């Protein structure tokens, strides 16, 4: 628990005791006391509507109740500097800012752990994201999903959740057959032999490279073997080639996974039919027109869904159900699936399947990643300058940089369409959101280096009571909010709240820097306190950027 949270608890307890004294209630009769941070700091550090909540019980107007509570609040409390009544009965609190300086040694001590909490209480979450077919490059939707998924996992972990990241490899569908046929055709081509290219094949340069690799590895060994043998071998190589490429691109994007789960393993380990039997045992399976159906309309889906077609082949829904059953059987409390915008209509049937399996539908959450449109100099960009084809994740990183790509994708709620301004992302000005935040970190690093060159080290025992200017207190207040913001971002599944916070923190630092001299050799004690203060800002900026997979540069 951080200093800010401790003070909130103290303040809530003080309000409760004031209500007991002023209104004559027992402690157990006092309703939950809610504290809000006013948008305008002129209205105090915190505000509560407890007087409104008590109006019915006390049979008085809220303002009259507030007037009876305020004198009790002013008694014997060093935390509160001033209390006032606003509007119909809101009670606004102005705290004694001295408590804020207690934050500095705490942040200096916690360092990389600053922002951690037990908010999640160790609840086990699995986040499955990206899960692109292993048949080509990652596109912009995948990139946005990767940035959101990885940032969310980082945030939830810091907030005290037990988080596992998973990539589901779609390696059992018809698209893999097309991949193998494409690789086979390019293999023959690399050997100088004629081969008909499949109508639905993959024509990318990577498949040409794969064909050359196969020719170099095997020579003409598989020219005259049976198709079954050749394609069985090429399937392994093609999947290894494509998944290796995906892994490399994602690692470059600073995204890693705890588990790469193969769809094929569901069949190899006999996980699909037991899932079907469980649905049947629970009474939600029926046969009609030679097909096997799941009665998802029992769970508010708009129509029932086919699991096995009349020709005996599975729909993609059945292995998806088996996969989600497997995830739940691994002991996760909640599953978070991050899907592309084209999967929005798939949510009701998947939640219905979860319930039909005997689990709560609340154990599945789905975050939808909306479309990304690229713009440069106000003009929409549809094709890569380098390849003349659709822009890939790799293209975007090469164009604007890794940090800007990660940060910009985290700036907006995932369920909103995004216009990605490449010109802004490349800008080295304060108009560029990631540059603005990184520059604050770099500037602090520069000041700390200058202080060190003059023999001034950051120390926890500096006299923090010397921090008394409004800009210093404002910076401290923002610093103290970090753990709460992380917990809120985790609870709301909203990485963009971290972006908003980092912008606020950078702004608070820049205001402080513009109005206070940090290195003042004529006032060493104040200098030491301010060095400690900016070090805490540096730590918090770094921790926040790390959550988003963005670097915190020492120099810019």
UniProtKB/Swiss-Prot annotation:
Tell me which SMART domains the record gives.
Arg_tRNA_synt_N, DALR_1
Q: Its Enzyme Commission number?
A: 6.1.1.19
Q: Does the keyword Glycoprotein apply?
A: no
Family matches, as InterPro entries: aa-tRNA-synth_I_CS (IPR001412), Arg-tRNA-ligase (IPR001278), Arg-tRNA-synth_N (IPR005148), Arg-tRNA-synth_N_sf (IPR036695), ArgRS_core (IPR035684), DALR_anticod-bd (IPR008909), Rossmann-like_a/b/a_fold (IPR014729), tRNAsynth_Ia_anticodon-bd (IPR009080)
Subcellular location, in the record's words?
Answer: Cytoplasm
The family note in this entry says: Belongs to the class-I aminoacyl-tRNA synthetase family.
Record protein name field: Arginine--tRNA ligase
Query: Organism classification, top ranks?
Result: Bacteria, Bacillati, Bacillota, Bacilli, Bacillales
Name of the coding gene: argS
